Amino acid sequence: MNQIFNLILVIFTIFFSGCNSFGQQKDDYSAKIDSLIGAKSPRGFNGVVFIQQNGKTKYAKAYGFADLNKKTPLKIDDKFSTMSIAKQLTAVLVLQEVEKGTIDLQAPIRKYLPDFKYAWADTVTVHQLLNNTSGLYSDDIDRPLKFKPGTAFNYSNMGYYVAGLVLEKQSGKSFEALVTSLFKTCHMHNSAYPNEINSKFLTKGHTVRKDSSYILNEELNFGPEHCFGSHLIVSPADLAKWNIYLHSGSLLKPATYKMMTSYVITNKHTLFSDDPIGYGYGLRINDKDNMLEIGHTGFHLGEGFTAVNLYYPKSKTSVIIMENVAHENFDIAYYFEQEIRKIVKESNLLK
């Protein structure tokens, strides 16, 4: 009898320890992220890390301050600037007009902006604006094109500015109205167009110098042209909602979504890889290591924000990191974004 009891006890012990170890294996990333951020080296982390899978929150923590001067603690639902993550929203709005037949991706800009003063409007297409092959420089629209349109890659905020002008002209609506409607569609209730009223609810951006001193940016100096591809107000959780709506087929037809997430040009980015990866419409496409990764970064030193939004379609996982600091030392600007990405990619979460 004692032998039978002991055997049953051993079986139960093995079973429950197996369940426990399985549970531990299931989350092999949270403690590593905590430890990484707790080390505060080579710089401190000041922001929110938000990880979601299949609509369920897997990790959500805020570290640091919304205002470094006042030492106001950051909260999970605080609002940050998207920086260039906004480009994918602009791209979706343009593609929705493509589906309506009001915009032709292969048409030159002149077709939609006949009075545009730049000669390159006769040759640069909407497609080239969206995938950064227009030849336009990043922040100076008056400079001659860097190369023949369609022949190379050059990241261009001005390209998205022009795409935004085309969008407003062909839709007959302001970008503010369009993006506000898009936020409602995606139930992004903690996000907004950065008008004067909404901007008051944005966390303060901080520019961190190489000597570790910082400048608190009381007001953002973005003009309307930056909203097309460089600045919208979102919370990390809302950005995860955006990923669900975009990648589930709720915003674009399958063929249109495929256009957005396909690429004909490649480019290097320090966060993703040492090798060139694809650039679609407002999205970087990394298909180099048997784990499709779709995402974009955002960084603005002068306004003081750093962000990354990553999505892994196979496991329906979002990894969102938003900081209200931007470091002048670019070697460490994306340090935590890079390291957290590595932790997640090596974890069981994506398997």
Say what each PLM segment does.
Residues R43, F65-K173, K210, I215:
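Active-site-proximal loop and beta-strand segments within enzyme catalytic domains
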Residues N198-Y214:
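Mobile, glycine-enriched helix-loop/loop "lid" segments at the mouths of ligand-binding/catalytic clefts
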Residues N131-F201, N217-E218, P224-A240:
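Catalytic-site signature segments of enzymes, centered on catalytic residues
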Residues Q3, S81-S84, S191, S235:
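Hydrophobic transmembrane-helix microenvironments that flank and shape a buried ionizable site
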Residues K58, F116-V124, G135-D139, T185-N195, ...:
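Secretory-pathway/luminal and periplasmic proteins that interact with or process carbohydrate-rich
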Residues C19-A62, E168, E176, T180, ...:
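Catalytic loop of the DD-peptidase/beta-lactamase superfamily, centered on the K-T-G motif
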Residues M1-D28:
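Bacterial Sec-dependent N-terminal signal peptides
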